[in-house]
């Protein structure tokens, strides 16, 4: 789509606005500018008048012209066949540099002095409009002899070529582009004045009648023109049409092409004399076809299919005397469906109608008649014949809040309404903050709130919308049952990965066995138990696991690692979720690394398994009758007791015929982790330090751990107990070794920083009464 600034000036006041700003504005409102170029005549090319023309004595094709340029009369030898006395022409004077780089100099042509050149449009750097030289007329402005040609707007213009998306058929005209620019630049759109009918002229009803079916998928407006002589296309229209490759040999077709490119309205011109007899009334039949398109015909002769093609036999000719001008609009969806069924197609017409031509037929017709009105020896028949169907436009309810939510920032209501009105939308204010919007007929692509938001953003400017991350808020569709399933499944997977087999048992248990293990019974007893061994609801998972382990041991299993996840009941018959583990027998299978003599499971081994399954935890001393008094502890997560762990009491091991056995039971509801704590990794190296400390026997390591943690040393990454040592020389003391790791997230640590932290740790240990070994 090609436009020029001067052409836009016909619709908008753009004298004070640069082409660069116009291009930037078009880009910002979604009309992509491909290129901007200057259209300027060379300097030292002026308006001249051919006073006299005589034939060159020594040439059949050359003429000697006396050309008045105001300040002087130049003798110019010209070879153009169309030059003649009485013409206004473009004269390149001495020193002018033409578009091809040629400099005009005084010269002799076949022995005759020539002091300049009469120019064609092509020689001036414009598109070719005719054979020979370019003849000037006052369509470009008042002709003044000697006036530089590039002081006329058409010869000092700027061309802008834009690329349009298929949905923007409304911008396939100067008027359509100007309409969007008016909204973006807050300018008033200049529309053509309504055509004023002349008095004492025949009405169109004398020569034309319409016969139309109801419910046509289009709009139609007809006018009649009487021609007394062949008309010519003026210079302004010729230059503009040549720029858009729309200049032809037929002047009527040229005027229609110009009006279409200017307004977007589609036109057809029918030669009345080609079909009807003299003094016969011309009846145009409009009929709706099977695919929705409209057939325009006269008797049995096809004139056109609206928006698809026009029959060549119906077109106007240079000698046409009466022509019927048809302005038409067809729903682009109808064109899209129907065009594939027509072998004959007008590609230029289809390009517009398929995307949506301008439906304001009166605007286009008034514009065209305004051009015809300036042509002498021409009669415009009064009145018009029209077929206007009321198409019900869809109503789109919108709210300013809804628009603001989609755009991502608050927008002013008055600004939104102003933009939509400028773009031709019909607005109906309703209650509760809603606005009912009807998209104009020239915007069939506007169908919902999002489309309207896009229009608002286009005009406001995407660069004026604050950047904001798109936030997706999805409703949580996971219920508690599914969450429990996933959490329990993950626990099972980790337990299996640690070598444990899952065991499943009834929720019923043996009340006597539970009592011997030290577990309370539920208050409510079973009235009719299945068996004597299953006579109560279980209060722990461990009894079943011990029985299962005992059975496995009796079947010569050397490594017994079992777990069970399920429900238990407290003394008040409330259901609780628990998970229990048991590791009985050997630590591992016999293999080369242990010389086929694997050790029995140790407390530390069992603790590592539980850590791998539930994560880090703390231990505190405990007292359970079911456990060995020397190897047992309560398990804490975030200072909350979640269960216990330890070695099964030797007495119970013997009663159940079990080898060395460790057990653990945890409250599932307390070990859940509803969130993950993520920390960045440091790319800098760690520095380690070890301390060996003497502690009295019976002194809890947790006291040391808690005191060090309370120091809140920023660079202390972690610390752990790595060794416990005792011998006769230490008597009532143990020697423990603690390893400390220091690291900074932002830089490499220096020794003095680490030493400072170690001094604080040593002072803390001294406050506990502990000394270095």
Swiss-Prot record:
Listed GO molecular functions? ATP binding; magnesium ion binding; phenylalanine-tRNA ligase activity; tRNA binding
Which segments constitute the B5 domain? 391-467
What is this protein called in UniProt? Answer: Phenylalanine--tRNA ligase beta subunit
Reactions mediated catalytically: tRNA(Phe) + L-phenylalanine + ATP = L-phenylalanyl-tRNA(Phe) + AMP + diphosphate + H(+)
The protein's location, in the record's own words, is:
Cytoplasm
Q: Which InterPro entries match?
A: aa-tRNA-synth_II/BPL/LPL, B3/B4_tRNA-bd, DNA-bd_dom_put_sf, Fdx_antiC-bd, Fdx_antiC-bd_sf, NA-bd_OB-fold, Phe-tRNA-ligase_IIc_bsu, Phe-tRNA-ligase_IIc_bsu_bact
Gene (name only): pheT
Instruction: Tell me which EC number(s) this protein carries.
Output: 6.1.1.20
**FDX-ACB domain mapped to chain residues:** 682-773
- Name the GO cellular-component terms: phenylalanine-tRNA ligase complex
Tell me the PANTHER family matching this sequence: PHENYLALANINE--TRNA LIGASE BETA SUBUNIT (PTHR10947:SF0), PHENYLALANYL-TRNA SYNTHETASE BETA CHAIN AND LEUCINE-RICH REPEAT-CONTAINING PROTEIN 47 (PTHR10947)
Q: Which superkingdom, per the lineage?
A: Bacteria
**Record keywords, A-Z:** Aminoacyl-tRNA synthetase, ATP-binding, Cytoplasm, Ligase, Magnesium, Metal-binding, Nucleotide-binding, Protein biosynthesis, RNA-binding, tRNA-binding
Identify the residues that the record assigns to the tRNA-binding domain, covering every copy.
Answer: 39-150
| Entry's family note | Belongs to the phenylalanyl-tRNA synthetase beta subunit family. Type 1 subfamily.
